[in-house]
Amino acid sequence: TGNSNHNGFKYGLTWMAYRPIHETECCIGNLHRYMPNYVARMWLKDKKGHPVAALYGPSSVVYDLGEGVTVKIDEITQYPFEEQVKFKFTFFKDGKRSADSHQMDFTYRIPGWCKAAESGFHTESKEWKSGDVFTVRLPMQIEVVDAPVQGKCIQRGPIVYSYAIPTNWMEDTKIYDNLAGKVSANPEFKSWELTPAGKWNYALVENMLRGLRVQRTGNSGFPFDLESVPVKIRVPVKGVKDWTLKEDRFTPALPETVVPESDQVEFIELVPYGSTTLRLTTFPTVKE
């Protein structure tokens, strides 16, 4: 919210709220840059000008291989939610689809999180022809990861998973002194106060975390909309006693001593971090 004060740097204030206007404009202005930067770096060239698949996602690209030969590559995948990445090649000679074979180096990258193969760039150098398909499989294991200070997180492949806390949305029309009177110039681009509308104070049941499985929802649509997430992970939890909202505004540090509300084990669904707004990502732990 606009009055959050749990950030050690200037104690948060509007820095911790969902709003289009920020005290320092470069923060809001830079926040969205990761996506076009990711897309711009998905496909690179090696020294010969041949294709390098550096970052994965559904895409198509055309490379000029010289001497009138071009190759169109269709990348077919649901990465980062699924393990398989397929590349389908179509070659053209002087603008017409080619039935001939063509020598080409195709380089792909194994991400550092993938333990099934040596990370880094690998090259497949051979004769290719139209219709060839090259498949990269990146096994994604569900991992329980220690957070830097305290608590544990759930990660699968490149994605960290969070509990999407039920949320009350309230428009924030207050004009804050630290913003020097700045307000959004677009009435449809509003400032929001988000507060919990349901239970959030959960601890992972540590000795029940083996054998976690991903649940595929079959949803289509934008995968980072909460209603459309393609994958979920169901985890065992217990409610934590006396872990409450400090000043009714934000989640405090994890409790050093976790006292369960009861012996009852509940199950909650975690979704990709990027599909949440108000979230619990780092959990305290408790025994069954």
Regions flagged by a language model, labelled:
Residues V85-K88, M104-Y108, K129-L138:
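Short, well-structured beta-strand segments within conserved domains
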Residues F89, D100-S119:
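Beta-strand-rich binding/interaction modules
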Residues T1-E82, K88, R97-S98, R137-E288:
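C-terminal beta-rich recognition modules with glycine/proline-rich loops and embedded aromatic residues
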Residues A116-V133, P139-P148:
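A surface-exposed beta-strand-loop module
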Residues P80, A99-S101, E127-K129:
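Surface-exposed coil/turn segments at beta-strand junctions on protein surfaces, enriched
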